[in-house]
Amino acid sequence: GGSQCGFCTPGIIMRLEASKDLLAHMCRCTGWQTINEAVQVRRGEVVLPQSDSRDLVAAQKRAALEGRATQVVGPHVALGAGGFADDIAPTNSLVAVPSVAGEWFVGETTADARRAAATVQGRKSSLSVTYPVTFPEEFAHVSFAHTLQTTWVEPAYLEPDAVWCEPHGEPVGPLLNGGAFGGKSKTSALALELQEVARRLANQHQRPVRVVLAREDVVRRSPKRPPMALAVRSDGSGEVWVARTSGLVDIISDYAPKWLIHEIDVDGPATSVDVRATGWAEVAVMKSSVSPETEWGDYVVSPEGAQAWARVDDSGIHIRVQCGLVLDAVVLRSYCIGAAHMGLGWVRSEGIAVNESGEPVDLTIRSFGVIRAVDTPSIEIEIIDNDGPSINGSDAVFAAVAAAAWRAAGFPSTWPCQR
């Protein structure tokens, strides 16, 4: 359970130290806890109960459900052999990188290409996050139990988009392991652009070409979670104003038919409904806020029918999840812990600053507000098995933890609330 996409683990394994020594590393998938647990098992500090040999085929099926993309499972993934595109490119490949203006430059090495493109390493800005979707002037707050405004949120997947191609061949990448929380797609505009660039440059130079984005390129080009303004009445009905995003109205109306939905045009980065649980999770959080807290905390049902309960208190995050036949408890638990970490960060700290021109200006992985290992509370997961069809469970956990974290914070009117 200490590895999902496998991008961060090689560097972490080199340390095998406590959470404070993970400050130089970032993991977006696991929420840190399962990495620490795996280290404790390796050191002999924790002894796992004996069991039959693990079914890695079933584990990969569960991982594909949770990551919503092909997912490789096995010890080799944690050691850096998960098959990321840039790791398996031919060693004699040229390197292509974009300039800020979008022109492509080619070099023998990444440094050569970046020098030719005159790229400047991205930095964290001093700007605060903003809330571009606002309530209309005539909006009557008094008729609603809770209101909430959110901002742009970076998916923050760790592997920057990369594609390589041989002359007259087919491009490889960018999505080979892990779902990137919906931030990557084989058919997205960005993926198609990178594939076409790799193919064109490989044919032009008659050499294999690696097309590689730096972190700042990813932030500028990849889609974000769209900002919203939401209001819920005590009976669970409500209204939502959303940054115009293809498919978002349909997702919300299917999940909450009685809600009124208003699309707003805002200047800002591209947004996508593919980002984890976009649209329905926001509404689920609002509806949970006016429902009595259950014995196990805030309760959320995903559009697929997965059920999750979550409570956030001083002792940590406590979760129950039911999502059909488990297939592999290690993988499911790992994804649910990662979803809890992400849901907590969504409420407390995650967001990116955007300038007056609508361009992202927080351009480093650390500037997105992802909760650090040392600041991550203990997360307990109870899995309820049944013989129903296996469905994604971690997205329901993501929404339930966000609902519980919002309740624990006293329902502040903006997220992130501790930035």
Label the model's feature ranges:
Residues 1-22:
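Zn2+-dependent cytidine deaminase-like catalytic core
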